[in-house]
From Swiss-Prot:
An annotated Gene Ontology molecular function: tRNA-uridine 2-sulfurtransferase activity
Domain of life from the UniProt record: Bacteria
Biological processes annotated in GO: tRNA wobble position uridine thiolation
Keywords noted in UniProt: ATP-binding, Cytoplasm, Disulfide bond, Nucleotide-binding, RNA-binding, Transferase, tRNA processing, tRNA-binding
Name of this chain's protein: tRNA-specific 2-thiouridylase MnmA
Keyword ATP-binding: yes
EC number, UniProt record: 2.8.1.13
Gene behind this protein: mnmA
Length: 367
């Protein structure tokens, strides 16, 4: 038996295939394994209730199959205060936040980590994220997952090296088809369950309708880059840079039939600015300013750094130069122009397979 037999790991069981296989792999590695199902949303919503009940039943079925205990905990208050309120605040300000990043920071790797250690006596927590970790020179690095299509390091850049050191990511070493194959071989209840794509913990629902419950819509003009009013939007919060669908406008009478894209949001005047064509110059930026910086395994940046950046999930890496500014912000200059750089989203930095950290995009640079 490996020396892992003295170590207790609590796996965050979501009711999905990745966390299910993670629990199995840790068992195979000799750890003492138990599961924890987190309930994070309390709003009165029958659809969500059904989905959460199904997820809990699936998590329980997997734990029964593997012969491990499943604990449950309610983090709804923490989620509301530390994730959802901030999410609404960002939308109110006309920015487009990423709730999954916030949720990982505040719930999965803070509330869960603390609860597992203090209440359940865990040495480690584990999740079904497609990332890896590496211990090197007395610190722990966060690495991209082996499966480039599923790599989730973009969503975990806010973790400290201490949090990474207390976390295990078993499926990060595998490709997704292999994870599905293992689940099928074990006849796990989640083997064929589709991946969730909704807002972290709130599930899949009609986003516009959902947001409208919490934020009053503020209709305004849709204006072309030349200043012509061509329609009305129902609220800037429903639109993001680079968006093409859902604008409700066709070609202009004398102009081209090329689709319209959102190229800017004038927050002061509540105006949505659009242009035709996916390669319109107004869609592109040469850089960005980022704030709320977090570096996984290093102190704040003291000198310019050559690395690569992603300004959204699943984007190809963009070579860039990162320069620290005086007020705990950074300026990032891309080697080539990048489309749809969106304030409120995260810019995440890499050197080869290592995720260095990132920050929130404050403004995009067009000069």
């Amino acid at each position: 038996m490996s020396d892992n037999s003295q170590k207790k790991v609590i796996v965050g069981m979501s009711g999905g295939v990745d966390s299910s296989v993670s629990a199995y792999l840790l068992q195979q590695q000799g750890y003492q394994v138990a599961g924890l199902f987190m309930k994070n949303w309390e709003e009165d919503d029958s659809d969500e209730y059904c989905s959460a009940a199904t997820d809990l039943a699936d998590a329980q079925a997997v734990c029964d199959r593997l012969g491990i205990e499943l604990h449950t905990v309610n983090f709804a208050a923490e989620y509301w205060d530390n994730v959802f309120e901030l999410f609404l605040q960002e939308y109110r300000a006309g920015r487009t936040p990423n709730p999954d990043i916030l949720c990982n920071k505040e719930i999965k790797f803070k509330a869960f980590l603390e609860f597992a250690a203090e209440d359940l006596g865990a040495d480690y927590i584990a999740t079904g994220h497609y990332v890896r970790r590496r211990d090197i020179n007395g610190t722990t690095q966060l690495l991209r997952g082996v499966d480039a299509n599923k790599d989730q390091s973009y969503f975990l850049y806010t973790l400290s090296h201490q949090q990474v050191a207390q976390s295990l990511f078993p499926v990060g070493e595998l490709e997704k088809p292999e994870v599905r194959r293992i689940a099928a071989q074990l006849d796990l209840a989640t083997a064929k369950k589709k991946d969730s794509t909704g807002i972290c913990f709130i599930g899949e629902r009609k986003f516009r309708e959902f947001l409208g419950r919490y934020l009053p819509a503020q209709p305004g003009k849709i204006v072309t880059v030349d200043g012509e009013t061509i329609g009305e939007h129902q609220g800037l919060m429903y639109h993001t840079l680079g968006q093409r669908k859902g604008l409700g406008i066709g070609g202009t009478k004398e102009g081209s039939e090329e689709p319209w894209y959102v190229v800017d949001k004038d927050l002061d005047n509540n105006v949505l600015v659009v242009a035709q064509g996916h390669d319109h110059p107004r869609l592109f930026s040469n850089g960005l300013i980022a704030q709320q910086l977090h570096w996984v395994d290093r102190l704040p940046l003291g000198a310019p750094l050559r690395c690569t950046v992603k300004t959204r999930y699943r984007q190809a890496d963009i070579p860039c130069l990162v320069t620290p500014l005086a007020d705990e912000r950074i300026e990032v200059r891309f080697d080539q122009p990048v489309a749809a750089v969106t304030p409120g989203q995260s810019a995440v930095f890499y050197q080869d397979e290592v995720c260095l950290g990132g920050g929130i995009i404050e403004t995009r640079l067009v000069d």
